[in-house]
Amino acid sequence: MIPGEQLLLVKTGMRHQYRYDGQFSKYNTVPKNKWTKQHTADTIFQSVRMGWMPFYPQFNENTLELSKEAQQNGAKTDDEIRNYVLEKLKSKKLHYAVGDPEAEENHPKVWYIWRGNAIMGSMKGHEYALKHYLGTHSNKIATDSKDHTEEVKWHDIAPEGKMDLVVDLNFRMDSSALYSDIVLPAASWYEKADLNSTDLHSFIHPLSAAIAPVWESKTDWDIFKLIAKHTSEIARQHLSEPQKDIVCSPLSHDTAGEITQRHVKDWYKGECEAIPGKTMHSITVVDRDYTKLYDKYISLGDRIKASGLGAHGNNYRCD
């Protein structure tokens, strides 16, 4: 199965908020050991390279260009491309973006907000997002911490306004919509057949459309379908040929990978061998055809029949 890209919101916020945090032991009553004296950002860096958590962007290089580089250096198969990437990581010629989040090549550029009020709502420490993500007024009162990171590269001057484009799917003019460059009018709860939940309680709401979406609003499915269609059209000009992409996936629960690390040994520091899927994240080569993004979005892929479906270590056939 093709691994899905994953990202945790908490680490997205840590792209800039870590500058205002100190050492664990400074604000928590914890025993003195190598874990409690770490900085949060350093721990996140370790968790990514050891395969505990995902992070995007992955590296300081474009992964499409990275696979081309591997092929230009003699890699002919997917396994050889994986080995090329692995060797670059081991030699530290290829760097993790999480290890230097302030570097310009590691900045996220496009932010889609969907089903959440990320700015001033879901995101904790929103003043830091306003300052560093959007480059706008922030009412920030905190100053940079004197406890600098040890592994994550520290920049004395933090960049502001990392994002080039913020797009919000919304039916309310909340704070995220107010700060977005583009607001796509989304259908509200009773204008679509869907599942919905909130952060107020654990209930899942199965909703049925009472009326059709009003005015220019569209269902989430139709909005993403149009985005996929136009992306495919643009891809015919800029990414007309099939591409090979590199995807790093964390070790997942309910799989063999969750029991591969009995002890915490960091391959990045030479404490053990770097073995994808065991001592570190998995490395997968994925074939992508961006010109067919729309066709794939509206179709049921043939991998369903070949590989089946499943979750949490279970798999079932779909003949």
Give the role of each language-model region.
Residues 1-168, 173-319:
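Domain-level signature for respiratory redox metalloenzymes
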